Design a protein with these regions (language model features):
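Active-site entrance/lid segments in N-terminal catalytic domains of soluble metabolic enzymes
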Residues: 1-224, 252-254
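Alpha/beta catalytic cores of nucleotide-metabolism and tRNA/nucleoside-modifying enzymes
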Residues: 1-21, 174-176, 198-227, 231-373
């Protein structure tokens, strides 16, 4: 069966401003969410974030997910403040494999002492369409209610809007079983899933369709949408939010910042790329040297080794060198300014007035070429 409708990528669309905006200046807008943070997650990629540099992302008001490549014991410590509900951390998630999640949160013996604690968990798997995943998440949520602790679950990835509908209908006591779902398969800059398996759904259309389903369902508490993959620039982040994503997850863009944990290289006097330490990278950057980050998808051979210490399957990711282009604080500063500017054009004083409430128009081929210049 062929579904005869066109799917759109970010680059196919632009945002139409409001007819008249009551915002006099972008300084009047608030682009931060209820936690005082940008609606952006740092992707759990071991060439971007780890247990040594996560704090700089958090200090720049971004949400973090500690990747599975970090030692299990170190990840457990990073749930924060001993996991206590009364000093819980709302902005940090810990990535777990499906088996780690099952052992930690689906065993009554292992959770019975979790009372009054808080856990933000990212069940980090590639295929968010498995029934087994949701069976485990349901069991884990049931145990969290039974033993009186807070379990917030992020998972994914999915690439079918109707899967989002099914996920939203999974509830216990009118609360969602899945709190956050990552939407998008094959769109990441380090991913080759789509080119090898042909599994994909154009990101802009996927977000829009999921948001329309959410409006249709009119549930009091609905699973949050995280647009994951395909972000190249500030504009893509803003479009994802305008289309209805509650959050945007970014990997490759953050790999280009000086503070990313990926191995750094510079061009030596022989014109060859040479590895350097993090401290040396900072010094070279300040002197104007061109640096590069070794970036790889987590489904690449290198990513598999980082997680499992061996190559375990056919790779669905790649490794490449990305130029270091900015410091994190400058990227964040620009992101805030551009988002506020877009909000001012659209008459949105607050983020919740902007997300999912905008009109976008399809560009002509010539316009797309012009935007790409």
């Amino acid at each position: 069966m062929i579904k005869k409708e066109i799917g759109y990528a970010y680059n196919d669309l632009t945002i139409v401003p409001s007819i008249i905006s009551n915002v006099k200046s972008r300084s009047e807008t608030n682009c931060m969410d209820a936690n005082g943070r940008l609606p952006i997650f740092v992707a759990p990629m071991s060439s971007v974030i780890n247990h040594k540099n996560y704090e700089i992302f958090e200090k720049n008001n971004l949400y973090t997910v500690i990747p599975r490549s970090v030692n299990y014991e170190d990840r457990m410590k990073l749930f924060g403040n001993n996991g206590t509900l009364f000093n819980d951390i709302h902005y940090r998630f810990i990535a777990l494999s499906l088996n780690e999640f099952k052992d930690c949160f689906c065993s009554e013996e292992n959770v019975k002492n979790n009372a009054n604690k808080h856990f933000n968990v990212c069940v980090d798997i590639a295929n968010g369409h498995m029934q087994y995943l949701y069976d485990l998440c349901k069991k884990a949520k049931e145990l969290s209610f039974k033993y009186n602790y807070k379990l917030v679950i992020m998972t994914g990835n999915i690439a079918n809007p109707e899967t989002y509908r099914e996920i939203c209908m999974m509830t216990i006591n009118y609360e969602p079983i899945i709190d956050y779902i990552r939407v998008g398969i094959g769109g990441g800059s380090g991913c080759i899933t789509s080119s090898n398996t042909s599994i994909h759904y154009p990101m802009a259309s996927l977000i829009d369709s999921c948001n329309n389903i959410r409006k249709e369902l009119q549930l009091k508490n609905c699973t949050k949408i995280i647009a994951d993959g395909g972000v190249r620039n500030y504009s893509d982040v803003i479009k994802a939010l305008a289309l209805g994503a509650d959050y945007v997850m970014i990997g490759g863009v953050f790999a280009k910042c000086l503070e990313s944990c990926g191995a750094k290289m510079f061009t030596n006097y022989k014109g060859e790329k040479e590895m350097c330490t993090a401290d040396a990278a900072y010094e070279l950057y300040e002197k104007g040297a061109q640096l590069y980050t070794r970036f790889y998808g987590m489904a690449s051979a290198e990513g598999q080794i980082a997680i499992n210490h061996k190559k375990t399957k056919t790779a669905e990711g790649i490794t490449k060198m990305l130029p270091v282009e900015y410091k994190l604080h400058k990227w964040v500063e620009n992101m805030q300014d551009y988002l506020r500017s877009a909000m001012s054009y659209c008459g949105a004083f607050r983020l919740d007035e902007f997300i999912g409430k905008q009109t976008l128009i399809v560009n002509s081929p010539g316009e797309i070429a012009a935007v790409n210049k």
